[in-house]
Amino acid sequence: RLPAMAMLGKIWDDDQDAARGAARQVGYVLAAELRSRGVDYSFTPVLDLDYGPSRVIGDRAFHRQSAVVIALAAALGEGLHLAGMGSCGKHFPGHGYVIPDSHVELPVDDRAFEAMQDDIEPYRQLPLDGVMAAHVIYNCIDCNTAVFSNKWIGYLRNDIKFNGVVFTDDLSMAGAGVVGGMLNRVETAYNAGCDM
């Protein structure tokens, strides 16, 4: 059984080299097992910072510190690539700070843009194949969730210079209901700049 990503963060706190090695191995095993069953892509790694109170992110987050998240996600990505699978960072620009679960309600992050820089840094630093946007409203930039925000997707493309695939999070989640039914969700995400 693969460990929760938070376990890799705990290993990091004691031994950084061991944590990098473990993350690389986890990425390889995850990708190799999925590919052996015909699955060629996994929405991993979670790049959200572990602020503590978010139960939905919980132990899926590597660590509280952005630099540690970057190091462990990079090692995990190396393992994924060694087994022939791409990486998809999520949940852009960061879901770890808010407590509500976007599967069942609509989270709002009221921080200033400057306060979000640690959350955004992994997307600047990592060589990701894909990015999944979050069903969270970040009032500092837009009143739409990141999935439905041409401002956030534009920032990802133009400022961060990400040129891979931009995915929505699951459009059946409650956090996606802000724009109406499924057809509106698909059209709004596509018009905001999401690829899939």
Language-model features, listed with the residues they occupy:
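Active-site-proximal loop/short-helix segments
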Residues: R1-P3, D40-R60, R64, G86-P107
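A short, structure-level motif marking secondary-structure boundaries and short turns
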Residues: D14-D17, R60-F62, Y138-N139, D170-L171
